[in-house]
């Protein structure tokens, strides 16, 4: 059996040089997604490397010089007072400290098919040997079949693991025709979509501009950000686009994904004014609806968010590459997204903490105490 060589990359220039081999492996890996692509994670590191005290910690597995495994990790150094550990192992693309969560979902180890067990074991052994470099770990928004769930399998650990439910991804299996899709909806929803679309067509002379047909990416991001801020403002919720790093990251990653035909931004205009926008990611046979926004008055009169989503679903049905439409993260299993004939799949966080009293206190405060406070606040 051929030996696997494992190395640790901490230098951004070495990370940059991995682009081609990284993406080749990511495309082959069973759990590889656009969120584990080089374009997404390198752009994230370029943007967020100075957001906090972070250290790049990429674990690279090779066999006969061929790349066969990647653990896309970082070490986040917290203040010494942090409970329950100050050196936290995390996945790249997660752990932003400025409030602008990028939501890099479904991350995992990137492994050559057929070598999952061996590569996971090599990574586990390396991490245990280097445990002086980290004290705990948090891996967020994993799916049920994650390779990370098998990390440290069979090992006697000085750390303890805990899984915590963390929302759902919400999917639509695309039918053969858009008519079939409409018929899958409840009658009230279907009639509302048809009525609003007819109203928009008869009352307004509108156009939809796209970045794949010449709309400048920076213009598109600026307009989308403004519309997202307006939408979130109506809901009295903060917009991630208020955070400069979040917007900078997306300006960067969209420009890298566009030549690969893996991104789309649509801006709907009425009388030249941007009134609705949808930002989507093309990931193999899945379209991820990532961010959206709309202008208040016209947005409600024509249900513009619904229009943008259902028209995007129509485009997906016509695209032979695509078989699923993904609304991405929902905190609630019974989200409004289910009205679009969607279904949910659970996600979870996997945490590793030291076995000590500080951990017990941390878990108590962030478990029953935190939930109790949330309930009390809801009753106010």
What residues fall within each predicted segment?
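N-acyltransferase acceptor-side catalytic subdomain
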Residues: 1-380
């Amino acid at each position: 059996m051929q030996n696997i060589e494992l190395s640790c990359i901490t230098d951004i220039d070495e990370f940059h040089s991995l682009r081609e081999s990284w993406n080749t492996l990511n495309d082959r890996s069973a759990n590889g997604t656009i969120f584990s692509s080089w374009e997404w994670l390198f752009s994230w590191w370029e943007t967020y490397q100075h957001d906090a005290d972070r250290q790049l910690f990429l674990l690279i597995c090779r066999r006969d010089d061929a790349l066969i495994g990647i653990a896309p990790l970082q070490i986040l150094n917290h203040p010494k007072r942090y409970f329950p550990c100050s050196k936290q192992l995390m996945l790249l693309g997660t752990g932003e400290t400025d409030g602008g969560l990028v939501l890099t979902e479904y991350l995992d180890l990137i492994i050559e098919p057929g070598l999952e067990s061996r590569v996971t074991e090599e990574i586990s052994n390396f991490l245990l040997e280097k445990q002086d470099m980290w004290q705990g770990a948090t891996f967020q928004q994993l799916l049920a079949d994650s390779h990370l769930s098998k990390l440290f399998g069979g090992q006697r650990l000085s750390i303890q693991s805990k899984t915590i439910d963390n929302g759902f991804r919400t999917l639509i299996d695309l039918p053969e025709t858009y008519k079939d899709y409409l018929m899958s909806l409840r009658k009230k929803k279907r009639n509302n979509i048809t009525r609003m679309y007819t109203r928009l067509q008869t009352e307004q002379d509108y156009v939809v501009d796209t970045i794949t047909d010449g709309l400048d990416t920076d213009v598109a991001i600026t307009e989308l950000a403004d519309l997202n801020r307006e939408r979130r403002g109506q809901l009295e919720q903060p917009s991630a686009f208020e955070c400069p790093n979040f917007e900078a990251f997306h300006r960067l990653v969209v420009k890298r994904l566009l030549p690969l035909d893996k991104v789309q931004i649509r801006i709907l205009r009425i009388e030249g004014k941007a009134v609705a926008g949808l930002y989507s990611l093309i990931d193999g046979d899945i379209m991820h609806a990532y961010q959206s926004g709309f202008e208040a008055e016209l947005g409600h009169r024509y249900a513009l968010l619904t229009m943008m989503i259902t028209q995007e679903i129509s485009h997906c049905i016509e695209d032979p590459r695509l078989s699923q439409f993904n609304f991405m993260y929902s905190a609630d299993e019974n989200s409004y997204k289910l009205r679009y004939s969607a279904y949910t799949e659970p996600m979870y966080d996997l945490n590793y903490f030291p076995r000590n009293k500080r951990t017990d206190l941390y878990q108590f405060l962030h478990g029953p105490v935190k939930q109790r406070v949330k309930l009390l606040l809801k009753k106010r």
